[in-house]
Curated annotation (Swiss-Prot):
Signal peptide: none annotated. Residues 214-225, 346-378 have a biased composition (Gly residues). This is Heterogeneous nuclear ribonucleoprotein A3. It comes from Homo sapiens. GO terms for molecular function: RNA binding.
Amino acid sequence: MEVKPPPGRPQPDSGRRRRRRGEEGHDPKEPEQLRKLFIGGLSFETTDDSLREHFEKWGTLTDCVVMRDPQTKRSRGFGFVTYSCVEEVDAAMCARPHKVDGRVVEPKRAVSREDSVKPGAHLTVKKIFVGGIKEDTEEYNLRDYFEKYGKIETIEVMEDRQSGKKRGFAFVTFDDHDTVDKIVVQKYHTINGHNCEVKKALSKQEMQSAGSQRGRGGGSGNFMGRGGNFGGGGGNFGRGGNFGGRGGYGGGGGGSRGSYGGGDGGYNGFGGDGGNYGGGPGYSSRGGYGGGGPGYGNQGGGYGGGGGYDGYNEGGNFGGGNYGGGGNYNDFGNYSGQQQSNYGPMKGGSFGGRSSGSPYGGGYGSGGGSGGYGSRRF
C-alpha cells in the first residue's frame, strides 16, 4: 500500500533550499550579481510573467524583469532573472537551450556595470587568461583549481622560448563558454597561494569583434535583439568613445597609450600595433603577450611595467600607467582615476555612461547618456 506524505509536508528539494537560504529567501553569502542571468533575444511578446514562468522551473526567482522603453513601454528584447542561489543559476544554464514564448533565447551570466567596460565583456569565449602565477605554479595546480568550474580542454603555461622560464601567465580552455563567464564574474582567485588576475582571453579578431558589433541597427540598443544590438545610436559598443569606436577600446586614436587596445597601446600595453594580446605577431613574438618588446612584465611597460606582474597589488598596478593612465584599478573593480568610470582618460565617457542608480545599469548596449543594459534610464 502506497503511503502518501501528509498535506503541506515540504518536498526534500524545497526543504533543502529553505535551509540553504537566509530569511530573505537567498543565501546571504552569495552576492546578487552571481545569482543573476541576462536573457537576450526575447520575443517582444514576452512579459515578466511568461519569463518568470519559464525560468522558475530551475529554482526560486527573487526578481524577474523584461526591460522596456520608458516612453513607449515596448520590450527591448532582453531581461534579467535573479535566482535565490548560484546553484539554481547553474541548473538553468545546464538546461540550455531555452525557448520562451516560442523563441530560443540566450541566457548569460549578468555582467556588472564596472565589468561591462572591459574589452570583450559580452563576447562568448571558451578560453581564459590567468596572470600573476608564480614560478612554483605548475599545470596541475591550475587544473586542480579550475576543474571545479567545468570541463577543461587544454592548459598552456607560457614559458620563454630560449630560457624555458615561466613567464607568469597561462591560458586555460574549457568546453563551455558559460564556465568562462562563471569564472570571470568571480572577482578573486587564489591559485597555489597566489592572487591571480583572471579574464577572458581575446584574440585580435575577438577584440575587433567587440568593436564591430556597433553597426547592426541604430536604435536604442538591445543585446542581440532587434533595433540596436551591441551598438548603434551614439555611445554603445563602438561609437562615441566606447568599445572599438573613436577613443575607445581598440579604437584608433583613443584609449591612451597603454590602455585596452587604444592606438598603439595594444591590450593594456601588452604590445603595440593592433590590439590583440599585445601586438601583431601573437603571444610570444615581438610585442606580444610577454614578448621581447613592451610585453608582459618585460622592460618597456607591459603588464605591470618594468616590474612585471609581480607589481600586482604592490603598487605596480597594470601597465605602468595603470589601466590607461590617470588612476589605479583597485580590487578588480573600483577605478579611482580622473574620469568618471573610465579606464583612463578616454574621450566620450565610459561604457553605459554614468551610473543610473539601477541594479540593471551600465551594461549591454546603452543608448548613450545614463545608460544601462540597453537603456538610457530606468
